[in-house]
Amino acid sequence: MWNPILLDTSSFSFQKHVSGVFLQVRNATKRAAGSRTSMKDSAGRRLGPKKYEGQDVSTGEIIMRQRGTKFYPGENVGIGKDHSIFALEPGVVRYYLDPFHPKRKFIGVALRRDLKLPSPHFEPTVRRFGRFELTNKRAAYKEENSISRKDYLAKPNILKQLEVRESKRKELQDKLSKVLRDELKLDIKDIELATSYLIRVRASLKNGYPIEDARFNSRYYLKEEERLKARRESWTNEKLSESLSKIDECSDLLNSSTSFNNKLELHQYISEQEKQALKAKLLEDLEKSQHLETKKDKNYIKALFKDACNFLTLSEEVHLRRKYLKSVFPETDSTVETKSGKKSIVSRRFDYTKNKVEVIARSRRAFLSKL
């Protein structure tokens, strides 16, 4: 095919004998020119079905050769440039009609011999995800124990992290058992069950659960683990019920005698009424000593916050610390100096109204760290 390309002659001038440029466009499907004398008919293309209904096919096998789409591709088959239909999955050939396309005839491949096409419209699609059944026991065992290269390279790091996590969990378990015995002096028969319950509660609190949900989830987890163990080891109903009652007794004792503060540290149980009373007393003491002028005042307010983590939430404690222990105090007559001295702390600030840089001298009492 020849396409003339018209050039813009307004931008530059041509020579006298140049009239235009022609470029040939060649396409992959363009038939070559034939001879006038060769009017012979070519051999047949062997069209028609190559696999019939119910025959087994492998991936890539041609099922139908045709000119045009006499048959349309159905499930698990593809169609080529010459409209040949071929299998995309190993299975059984099915010729069928689709009620959603009543004027078309389809060819598909069923993945199993008991499956019929078309598949039910609202049912899940049957897929292999590139897998096939291994009948050889040795090959099946090898496949079960094989891992990808990416997982193989990451395996040492994963095992190391698991060891670190297990060691941290063991340290936390020892720490909690020491607190239960030495500080709280609780008479607990199964200390391992108690520490495992407290670790689950602490993890739930760390993930943002309320204390009631954390306790419920921890108790439910331990009970479910015990039921699964009983099923594996074929326990009797009496033994299982006795084990579950131990979990209930231990969790009830811990819920009524222990609690976690906002730093996730175990301490003596404090009721909600006691927490509100301690919070009100703390606010009253903080209001009395609002003005920080000396190091003694700073240490006094810090001492008030010493046990605040036991009855305040983390957000409440942070809010109160930012309010009463400000790192930089507001600019007042007592903290702003008219002249800068040797002990003054000078800062420069741009004044947009006056359009100039102001030099502000402040005393050391204006900064909490300098008291």
Curated annotation (Swiss-Prot):
It is found in: Mitochondrion. It comes from the Eukaryota. InterPro entries: Ribosomal_bL27, Ribosomal_bL27_CS, Ribosomal_bL27m_C. The keyword Ribosomal protein applies. Coiled coil: none annotated. GO terms for cellular component: mitochondrial inner membrane; mitochondrial large ribosomal subunit; mitochondrion. Disulfide bonds: none annotated. GO terms for biological process: mitochondrial cytochrome c oxidase assembly; mitochondrial translation. Its main location: mitochondrion. Residues 1-27 form a transit peptide. Component of the mitochondrial large ribosomal subunit (mt-LSU). Mature yeast 74S mitochondrial ribosomes consist of a small (37S) and a large (54S) subunit. The 37S small subunit contains a 15S ribosomal RNA (15S mt-rRNA) and 34 different proteins. The 54S large subunit contains a 21S rRNA (21S mt-rRNA) and 46 different proteins. Belongs to the bacterial ribosomal protein bL27 family. Present with 2300 molecules/cell in log phase SD medium. Component of the mitochondrial ribosome (mitoribosome), a dedicated translation machinery responsible for the synthesis of mitochondrial genome-encoded proteins, including at least some of the essential transmembrane subunits of the mitochondrial respiratory chain. The mitoribosomes are attached to the mitochondrial inner membrane and translation products are cotranslationally integrated into the membrane. This is Large ribosomal subunit protein bL27m.
